[in-house]
Amino acid sequence: MSAQLLEGKVVAAAVLEDVARRVAVLKDKGISPGLGTILVGDDGPSVSYVNKKRETCKQVGIASFHNEIPASATQSDLLAAVRDFNDSPDVDAYIIQYPLPKGFDFNEALNLMLPEKDADGLHPVNLGRLVLQEPGPVPCTPAGIRAMLQHYDIAIEGKEVVVIGRGPTLGRPLSLLLTLKQPYANAAVTVVHSGIKDLGAYTRRADIVIAAAGCPGIVQPDMIRPGAVVISGGISWEGRKLLPDVDEAVGEVAGWITPRLGGVGPTTVAMLLLNTVQAAEERARRAGKL
């Protein structure tokens, strides 16, 4: 068996087409959506990711604002950058690129952010809204994974889903998202992690396995039921080499799988811009222009 590919680039293109259309509508009404980025230090993968976000903003017509802070700066400098974007009328939403260098407190900066300007959907208020099924920005990688399953019309309701990873940016919010009583959710979700000795005892019974651990090769072929859906959401870096959570040979067992490149990453960026245009639409509604 050779698995069919879940092409994140295809899913992202469809999302970005919708974003570009909505941006054009807003601009016709005098509203120009803007996305801000706070980057601390010069970590290679972070710089590449931020550059990709900027390129995609340009593609769909979203203005891009940047605040680059040297790693030698202080926590006070980071908090000042957050306040600047909070106060800026041109920035509808923004991100604090994670991870931060040692010595910086991400949670303190995140809590200072205005929840309505949280492009990543990670502010405690917005995670609470996700729990309560209230409107708000959804964390981008979980939202992108759900959009991918929806795009390929892969049934989730009532299915057994195993999420490997419990981090605040992917594993935990994804497990919440997939248990909501909504279309393309309402699944039976089990959350496991790298501290469990026999992960295969959980994954072999799953219809869908989503790896979000950031542990290279944590998912091996003998851990997957033939025909299952396998999504690699967690990554690690060895220098500039990307190492996915899912071993390449899993593609010989799975029914569907994300490719090594062009899987979840493009959908994450697309959902970031979707959150941004939704924030701009809310600004337009407050101004009576939408």
UniProtKB/Swiss-Prot annotation:
GO MF, any single term: methenyltetrahydrofolate cyclohydrolase activity
GO BP: any one term: purine nucleotide biosynthetic process
Keyword Nucleotide-binding: no
EC number(s) reported in the record: 1.5.1.5, 3.5.4.9
Biochemical pathway: One-carbon metabolism; tetrahydrofolate interconversion
Statement: the UniProt record of this protein carries the keyword NADP: yes
Catalytic activity: (6R)-5,10-methylene-5,6,7,8-tetrahydrofolate + NADP(+) = (6R)-5,10-methenyltetrahydrofolate + NADPH; (6R)-5,10-methenyltetrahydrofolate + H2O = (6R)-10-formyltetrahydrofolate + H(+)
Cellular compartments per GO CC: cytosol
Record keywords, A-Z: Amino-acid biosynthesis, Histidine biosynthesis, Hydrolase, Methionine biosynthesis, Multifunctional enzyme, NADP, One-carbon metabolism, Oxidoreductase, Purine biosynthesis
InterPro entries linked: Aminoacid_DH-like_N_sf, NAD(P)-bd_dom_sf, THF_DH/CycHdrlase, THF_DH/CycHdrlase_cat_dom, THF_DH/CycHdrlase_NAD-bd_dom
UniProt-annotated binding residues for NADP(+): 165-167, 194, 235
Function noted in UniProt: Catalyzes the oxidation of 5,10-methylenetetrahydrofolate to 5,10-methenyltetrahydrofolate and then the hydrolysis of 5,10-methenyltetrahydrofolate to 10-formyltetrahydrofolate.
Stored HAMAP family: THF_DHG_CYH (MF_01576)
Family: Belongs to the tetrahydrofolate dehydrogenase/cyclohydrolase family.
Subunit: Homodimer.
Name recorded for this polypeptide: Bifunctional protein FolD
Source lineage: Bacteria, Pseudomonadati, Thermodesulfobacteriota, Desulfuromonadia, Desulfuromonadales
